[in-house]
Swiss-Prot record:
Pfam families: Thiolase_C (PF02803), Thiolase_N (PF00108). Pathway: Lipid metabolism; fatty acid beta-oxidation. It is found in: Cytoplasm. Coiled coil: none annotated. This is 3-ketoacyl-CoA thiolase. One of its GO terms (molecular function) is acetyl-CoA C-acyltransferase activity. Belongs to the thiolase-like superfamily. Thiolase family.
Length: 391
């Protein structure tokens, strides 16, 4: 396809290996250093992109305190080849933060407010725990269900409403690990993982070019033996069917169609449409349904037009109802999360939006797809979606 001057194109994508938050490979690496390394290496492998042209570094991060505080986007940017004259901002839409970073850059490009952006995100959940420094307002319970901030219970609710069984969830969790392991063995992650130094379980410094979160030894019997993680009496959501708590970062170079043509760059994809939507916080995991429907309508497409889908696997109990109501549950094995998802790879909050978007682009490239959807639920009841077209 030919590009229009204000089209938003993805030039390249990279991510760190996903590390376990408890004693994992990134345990001695700070979030800013992880981010700076990733940005620097991605720019290094895209020599046609002059760092001086970067308008803004837009970085997703949820818990913006400790090493992730004081505008981590700027902290990381200052340690890269990007000059001090370029700007940087940190954004949060909880789980959808780095996809929001992508949308912010896209909107700037579409309106002529910049041509070259670096976007992505990071979350070091081992150094800055999920609830560190968080003080929820008790008055919220007057406006939303008391458990709306407890993601596992919202997944339990959504699964119950849609009749999702424990066995269905266990099968979905097993699938995630099997597909992620298969992708690793077959080298499918090679283009997206940017190697990093880290520490192995014995404390030795080594270069990691693989995700240490994947458990190829996972069995259906093992998953079935796990106790409910959030509702001990009658719950069906377990640690094995929930996204892992992990550390990681992801990064994209985004630019206008005009600048890509001027530089002679063949982009990975162009953004066809974007959308966000809200749902009741008590069923926060349902957000991808309205946001995807909205994005498809804006692009003049239907779900039948979409070749591949990346849906963030916050919980199996959440992902399955979304796929059911998007009418792709029966096409899951052909179209959805073909390299596994967050159950196997983890969900470092600020990282995940750009991570699933980049993984989608690699799946499309490797399998010859043209149109793809990246979508995710967002804590407290939101959904965010991006529709991509490969060029």
């Amino acid at each position: 396809m030919s590009l229009n001057p204000r089209d938003v194109v993805i030039v390249d994508f990279g991510r760190t290996p996903m590390g376990r938050s408890k004693g994992g490979m990134h345990r001695n690496t700070r979030a800013e250093d992880m981010s700076a390394h990733l940005i620097s290496k991605l720019l290094e492998r895209n020599g046609k992109v002059d760092p001086k042209e970067v308008e803004d570094v837009i970085w997703g991060c949820v818990n913006q305190t400790l090493e992730q505080g004081w505008n981590i986007a700027r902290m990381a940017s200052l340690m890269t080849p990007i000059p001090h004259t370029s700007a940087a901002q940190t954004v949060s839409r909880l789980c959808g933060s780095s996809m929001s970073a992508l949308h912010t850059a896209a909107q700037a490009i579409m309106t002529g407010n910049g041509d070259v952006f670096v976007v992505g995100g990071v979350e070091h959940m081992g150094h800055v725990s999920m609830m560190h420094g968080v003080d929820p307002n008790p008055h919220l319970s007057l406006h939303a269900a008391k458990a709306s901030g407890m993601m596992g219970l919202t997944a339990e609710m959504l699964g119950k409403m849609h009749g999702i069984t424990r066995e269905q969830q266990d099968l979905f969790g097993l699938r995630s690990h099997q597909l992620a392991h298969k992708a690793t063995v077959e080298g499918k992650f090679k283009d997206e993982i940017i190697p990093m130094q880290g520490y192995d379980e014995n404390g030795f410094l080594k270069v990691f070019d693989f995700d240490e979160t994947i458990r190829p030894e996972t069995t259906l019997e093992g998953l079935a033996s796990l106790k409910p993680a959030f509702n001990p009496k009658g719950g069906t959501v377990t640690a094995g069917t929930s996204s892992q708590i992990t550390d990681g970062a992801s990064c994209m170079i985004v630019m206008s169609g005009q600048r890509a043509m001027d530089l002679g760059i063949q982009p990975l994809a162009v953004i066809r449409s974007m959308a966000v939507a809200g749902v009741d916080p008590a069923i926060m995991g349902y957000g991808p349904v309205p946001s995807t429907q909205k994005a498809l309508k804006r692009a003049g497409l239907t779900m039948a037009d979409i070749d591949f889908i990346e849906l963030n696997e916050a919980f199996a109990a959440q992902a399955l109802p979304v796929l059911k109501d998007l009418k792709v549950l029966d096409k899951m094995d052909e179209k959805v999360n073909l390299h596994g998802g967050a159950i196997a790879l983890g969900h470092p909050f600020g990282c995940s939006g750009a991570r699933i978007s980049g993984t989608l682009l690699n799946v499309m490239k490797q399998n010859g797809g043209t149109l793809g959807v990246a979508t995710m639920c967002v804590g407290l009841g939101q959904g965010i979606t991006t529709v991509f077209e490969r060029v």
